[in-house]
Amino acid sequence: MQFTFEQIFIAMLLTLFAGFSTAIGSIIAFFSRKDDLRVLSLGLGFSAGVMIYISFMEILPTALKDFKNHYDSHWAELLGLACFFGGILISLLIDKLIPEDVNPHEPKEDLSELKICPLPQKGQNPPKFHPGEKLHQINTKALKRTGIFTALAIAIHNFPEGFATFISSLDNLTLGIAIAIAVAIHNIPEGLAVSLPIYHATGDKKKAFIYSALSGFAEPLGAFVGALILLPFIGDLTLAISFAVIAGIMVFISLDELLPAAKTYDKAHDSLYGLIAGMAIMALSLNLLGQ
């Protein structure tokens, strides 16, 4: 199966768009507090709805159809399901390899509400504060290190997402655009997770922004590696395997990352409303476009 330069270029652009949305999260970190981020609950729920719907209603069925071009129905379904759960396993292993204290998807105290204060050096008096004041003495070097390791953790997570966006965009531009938007929404709070500790530790907006943007660079890198490895061999069977694995990765991301993160910013049932809206809009758009 051959792809034109235009197809590859557009797929890479969509992956770049999805990856560098971490920079948007970085900018939000400079101006917003947690209480101002209720819209993230809707957005993350919406992103999860898009990913779950596409995975089960479009990508996995497409993979099974392609498998059936090479195997009988029984073996095609078994192979498709094996690749689907293989995608989940890959995501799970990546998640387990990252320590909890730097994993951006593990719950931790919201840094935006902390009053940052360096630990006193030897011979210095501790800082004074009034009873009841919420003051956290935080070693700014440790805080900065947390932000950097979080950036590395997010980069590892984003690598397979970049591959998923790129391959989907090559085969079906409509699906690729939907996935790119969903991944971009998902990356915004990840940019926050990187930017907040670095910004609070250093007071340097530029440095916090750069680290957030670089953490998203893994997505186009994942697309580039996928292109180098798979493009020479892409056919129905390769796409079938890729799509089934991608469906598993996207379902894991939705259930393990997006929905829990959406609940963090939730008020009432915002995350649920976003989830339903994402599914409904995706279903309607695919139907109208004849997918």
UniProtKB/Swiss-Prot annotation:
Pfam families registered for this protein in UniProt: Zip (PF02535)
Q: Signal peptide location in the record? A: none
Tell me what reaction this enzyme catalyses: Zn(2+)(in) = Zn(2+)(out)
Q: What are the subcellular locations of this protein?
A: Cell inner membrane
**Which residues does the annotation say bind Zn(2+)?**
161, 186, 190
What are the protein's UniProt keywords?
Cell inner membrane, Cell membrane, Ion transport, Iron, Membrane, Metal-binding, Transmembrane, Transmembrane helix, Transport, Zinc, Zinc transport
**Membrane-spanning ranges:** 8-28, 39-59, 74-94, 147-167, 174-194, 209-229, 233-253, 271-291
Primary location recorded for the protein, binned into one broad class: membrane
Annotated positions binding Fe(2+): 158, 161, 187, 190, 219
- List the InterPro entries hit by this protein, alphabetically: ZIP, Zn_transptr_ZupT
One GO cellular component term of this record is:
plasma membrane
- Per its record, what are the GO molecular function terms? metal ion binding; zinc ion transmembrane transporter activity
Bilayer topology: Multi-pass membrane protein
The record's similarity note reads: Belongs to the ZIP transporter (TC 2.A.5) family. ZupT subfamily.
Family matches, as PANTHER family: ZINC TRANSPORTER ZUPT, ZINC/IRON TRANSPORTER
What is its biological role?
Mediates zinc uptake. May also transport other divalent cations.
Q: What is this protein called?
A: Zinc transporter ZupT
Question: Which organism was this protein described from?
Answer: Campylobacter jejuni subsp. jejuni serotype O:2 (strain ATCC 700819 / NCTC 11168)
Lineage, top ranks: Bacteria, Pseudomonadati, Campylobacterota, Epsilonproteobacteria, Campylobacterales
